[in-house]
Amino acid sequence: MVRVFYYDEETGDTIDSLHPEICSKQKALSLFTVLSEARGSFFGLVDQNGNVLQFICLNDDKWRVDKPIPKEKGAYFCEASWNTCKKLIECIYDNVPIENYVYLEFELF
């Protein structure tokens, strides 16, 4: 079971990250598809193990992908296109390592 949180900078629509909602793969992809590409919009997933993957819009078709690792006091990250982000969302639902599709760098918080 995967849970979702998001915030749309243009519309103000949100699911709070403190209370993410269980969401099917199709619904998650649909929510991401209608999310505005306004700077500051974000979308996040929490997998069944509590791992978080979040996408923050930087500008049209440019997203920062973050995979926080609190015990390492940092996050793995990359920049990706909207289409790549959709593929990464599918990876979470299909239990496929996102590292198969993107190279992630590590940075401290």
What are these regions (language model features)?
Residues 1-47:
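Negatively charged, low-complexity tracts enriched in Asp/Glu with abundant Ser/Thr
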Residues 2-11, 51-80:
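Intrinsically disordered, low-complexity regulatory segments enriched in Ser/Thr/Pro
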Residues 12, 25, 35-36, 48, ...:
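Short linear sequence motifs
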Residues 15-17, 52-56, 109:
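Short, solvent-exposed polar/charged micro-motifs at secondary-structure junctions
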Residues 37-51, 97-109:
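Short glycine-rich, low-complexity/disordered patches
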Residues 73-109:
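Mixed-charge, Lys/Arg-enriched low-complexity segments
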